[in-house]
Amino acid sequence: MKDQAAQVAQVSLTWPAIRTTAMAAIAALGLSGCTGIGYYWQSVSGHLQMMNAARPVSDWLDDAQTPEQLKTRLALSQRIRSFAASELNLPDNASYRRYADLQRRAVVWNVVAAPELSLTLKTWCFPVAGCVGYRGYFSEAEARAEAARLQATGLEVGVFGVPAYSTLGWLNWAGGDPLLNTFIAYPEGELARLIIHELAHQVVYAQDDTMFNESFATAVERLGGQRWLATQASPAARAEYAAFDGRRQQFQALVRATRHRLDAIYDLNWAPAPARAAQVAMKSIAISDFKQQYEQLKTAWGGFAGYDPWVAQANNAAFGAQAAYDELVPGFEALFKREGGDWRRFYDAVKRLASLPKEERHQALETRNTDK
């Protein structure tokens, strides 16, 4: 089981340390006609197939055919689920009380795209979910076909398999979001963080603001995951997580530094053609340096290669997507501290921020970060 967990954790890193809220299916429920019936159909049918495959965790635990390793993980997931509700004040509802084996490595594949000299992601807008910087597909082949189409228009693209997505609690009446084989074998600390992250999306959702939504959920998963490990996990689980998280933090720091370097280069993207050629050259050097520094990290990690798939397709789309998940996290963590570590007060404060115009809420979080 440990080898399986390591393998699954490595696969998840194709969307590195970013357990995304894909919302592919829930967004499709409000699609306008111009989006296309094909995308609508794959979104709805893919989600329904997943829901139909899910069975209550209690059924899996009572089934003599269920492998003991899976029973152990499912039992752990239910302890985490109860902890999230009782200790973190996250919603206590139908989500993550059922399990489905999808017989594939990802639940959806997200397509992201950005211009040659910008980290600003292309967005897709839906009447229900608002505008998001990715487009989700239940079929990897369809995702790659969409990426190829976008690439043909001159955009840089990325296709990332993701292990989970949230329906924001809107479908709890139909059974909620299920546990999936795509993440159930994660190391304990990572499993706790994923469940906490996805439940956080059911607390607050600001339309048209992926960065706010994902940074909030990431802050909750970090704070809540730390509490789980400190109070519930075994010393072995804490040690395993410390090694895993240490690598993640080093990788994220490298990605963040490179992203800021690219941003500085692209600040001149209004320049005439000769200057643009210089920008392209500087960009190439920055990404080459990123890959060289990553190889140095791998050596220090003893050869751990979990981030290889992400690095292999590192481009503006990949760096732009990462920004949504960590840019505002320090501000949210500072806000949690200002609210005395009280989860209910923290969530209420975040809801007030979500009611503000986008620029105002971002500025408020950035100010809190500098004042902490």
Give short role names for the model-derived ranges:
Residues 51-68, 124-132, 312-314, 330:
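Acidic/histidine-rich, surface-exposed loop or edge segments in extracytoplasmic proteins
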Residues 32-33:
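C-terminal motif of bacterial Sec signal peptides marking the signal peptidase cleavage site
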Residues 38-43, 47-58, 182-189, 214, ...:
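Metalloprotease/metallohydrolase-associated module, dominated by Zn2+-dependent proteases
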Residues 56-87:
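Post-signal-peptide N-terminal segment of Sec-exported extracytoplasmic proteins
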